[in-house]
Regions:
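C-terminal hydrophobic helical "lid"/dimerization subdomain
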Residues: 271-323
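Hydrophobic/small residue at the entry helix of a nucleotide-binding pocket
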Residues: 152
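Glycine-rich phosphate-binding loop and adjacent beta-alpha segment
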Residues: 171, 218-289, 323
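Short, glycine/polar-rich helix-capping loops at beta-to-alpha or helix-loop-helix junctions
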Residues: 93-96, 171-179, 243-248
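Glycine-rich beta-strand-centered segment in the early N-terminal region that forms part
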Residues: 22-39, 49-91
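Short glycine-centered segments of the SAM/dcSAM-binding site in methyltransferase folds
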Residues: 83, 142, 166, 231-232, ...
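Adenosine-nucleotide cofactor-binding segment
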Residues: 145, 161-219, 270
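NAD(P)H dinucleotide-binding glycine-rich loop of Rossmann-like/cofactor-binding domains
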Residues: 37, 46, 77, 86-149
């Protein structure tokens, strides 16, 4: 029997249990994927703690890469042995095998390794949505990226530089500052500093056109103060906790600001949207415009250790669970 990580009670990393599970047969429109690499994301932590409450027991995880192991009767676009990857709107990736709808899988190009794919499906497609759909970053504009040394942040930094933007990167340590400088950040601010004051100084008092903030509660209001008039605040994560309710007048008095709290799956809702976004991501990776930094790997059965490292801000780039 195959194995999976399951959660029977919400809580700390210790609730992640390595268990035997049934090997299921695919339905007519499904593909069974034998996982080789699984991406770790903060959304996995939210699901483990119960911030995003699913029905227990839960197999966590949203992104993975692997090999097609079995096909449903109506699936024509894949064959057994094909290399595939996915990002899913539902949990289930922390497992040796998984059933997936065929229209939510993408073929992996030959030049993209399994661990690379697992490290970038959710994070890379999030970066694509942030920089190419939610706010189309333009050459010459100045943007701010929080947690710029993290999985999404490091991809977004490289993508923004490819588009010709100037990037102010906010990070949590000198080691992470060195990493984002290696990836061509124009300015670096440490998170314990007065970020808004630093940003205003770096931009001649004007501020930035857009802030991408995955940290949440601890950085939200300072992020608003980094924006120029009519700037856009994109809050897309809760690493420090959910953002508290905000009165619309707070946006008005800070310069008629715009605020959005996007979810990736609204931007890849159809198979066509998914395939288009994935192709754009893969093309940039294959041409070397974006490098995927896998900072650390753990065997799947040690997922609890990986969660502890992620929550304590000890990781850089992406973390991959291996089988």
């Amino acid at each position: 029997m195959p194995n999976a990580i399951r959660i029977h009670n919400f809580g700390g990393p210790e609730v992640l249990q390595w268990e035997s599970v049934d090997l299921l047969e695919p339905g007519p429109d499904q593909v069974r994927v034998r996982h080789t690499a699984i991406g770790l994301n903060f959304i996995d932590v939210y699901e483990r703690t119960g911030l995003y409450q699913g029905q227990l027991p839960i197999v966590p995880g949203r992104e993975a890469a692997g090999v097609v192991d079995a096909l449903g009767s109506r699936v024509k676009q894949f064959a057994v042995g094909d290399r595939v990857a996915y990002v899913a709107s539902s949990t289930g990736a922390y497992s040796e095998y998984r059933l997936m709808p065929a229209d939510r899988l993408v073929h992996l190009p030959d030049g993209v390794a399994d661990q690379t794919a697992a490290a970038m499906m959710l994070k890379g497609l999030t970066a694509q949505a942030l920089l190419r759909q939610i706010h189309r970053v333009r050459k010459g504009e100045t943007i701010l990226i929080h947690a710029a040394a993290g999985g999404v942040g490091l991809i977004a930094l490289q993508w923004a530089k490819h588009l010709g933007a100037k990037v102010i990167a906010v990070v949590g340590s000198e080691a992470k500052a060195a990493l984002v400088r290696e990836h061509r950040a124009d300015h670096v601010v440490l998170g314990h500093e007065d970020v808004a004051a630093q940003v205003k100084s770096m931009t001649g008092g004007r501020g930035v056109s857009v802030v991408y903030d995955s940290v949440g509660k601890d950085t939200f209001f300072a992020s608003l103060d980094c924006l120029q008039p009519r700037g856009l605040m994109v809050t897309y994560g809760n690493a420090s906790g959910p953002v508290p309710p905000i009165a619309p007048l707070e946006l008005s008095k800070r310069g008629s600001l715009f605020l959005t709290r996007p979810t990736l799956f609204h931007y890849i809702a159809t198979s066509r949207e998914l395939q288009r976004a994935a192709k754009e991501l893969f093309d940039l990776v294959l041409k070397g415009a974006i490098g995927i930094h896998v900072g650390q790997t753990y065997p799947l059965q040690y997922a609890a250790q990986a969660h502890r490292a992620l929550e304590s801000r000890q990781t850089t780039g992406s973390t991959v669970l291996t089988i």
